[in-house]
Amino acid sequence: MAGKSAREKIKLVSSAGTGHFYTTDKNKRNTPHKLEMKKYDPVVRKHVTYRETKLK
């Protein structure tokens, strides 16, 4: 049986307030801080900052 994974599923939410989000996973041992990256938001058709939130 596989052990508990170090990777955790997360949701990256757009800071533009459009409600658009991406889902991904990250290694919580290597990156304990919250991710923040620039990605394309198709609603506003621009690259904006996406911040990590918990995936429910």
Swiss-Prot record:
Keywords: Ribonucleoprotein, Ribosomal protein. GO terms for molecular function: structural constituent of ribosome. One of its GO terms (cellular component) is cytosolic large ribosomal subunit. Gene3D superfamilies: Ribosomal protein L33. GO terms for biological process: translation. Pfam families: Ribosomal_L33. InterPro entries: Ribosomal_bL33, Ribosomal_bL33_CS, Ribosomal_bL33_sf, Ribosomal_zn-bd. Belongs to the bacterial ribosomal protein bL33 family. PANTHER family: 54S RIBOSOMAL PROTEIN L39, MITOCHONDRIAL, LARGE RIBOSOMAL SUBUNIT PROTEIN BL33M. NCBIfam families: PRK00595.1, rpmG_bact. This is Large ribosomal subunit protein bL33. It comes from Halorhodospira halophila (strain DSM 244 / SL1) (Ectothiorhodospira halophila (strain DSM 244 / SL1)).
